[in-house]
């Protein structure tokens, strides 16, 4: 079950970014954070969202070398959207179609490396949110998730 409390997603992202910045990535990547100012707090389980964001950044780092990983937070009426974008290897169409279903990986050691996109999907949908991705082989991946500003 989720433990929902008023949460500032911008502060949460700064906290996660600080953790990653203090441990240089093996891929020599630059981490960039872009946060839209003055967004309201939302009702969320911060621990679970940190788990999702950490997993998405770890995935991006694992598939990106000497590139850029961008984390952005934007708001639109009723929703806040976080995007973790990388300049890495990207995914094939088949991998992209199955990525949120919980049984596909570009990396045979995948399950040793975090919770997986399927669990991210479960956490976001439990918040009344939605998660989706865009990816092209050789051009990187963008994973988005949107959370409602009011409980659904």
Predicted regions and their residues:
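Short helix-loop "hinge" at the ATP-lid/N-box region of the Bergerat-fold HATPase_c
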Residues: 60-61
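A conserved beta-strand-to-alpha-helix junction within the catalytic ATP-binding
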Residues: 3-18
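Conserved catalytic submotifs in the C-terminal HATPase_c
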Residues: 3-7, 30-40
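Short beta-strand/loop element within the Bergerat-fold HATPase_c
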Residues: 68-78
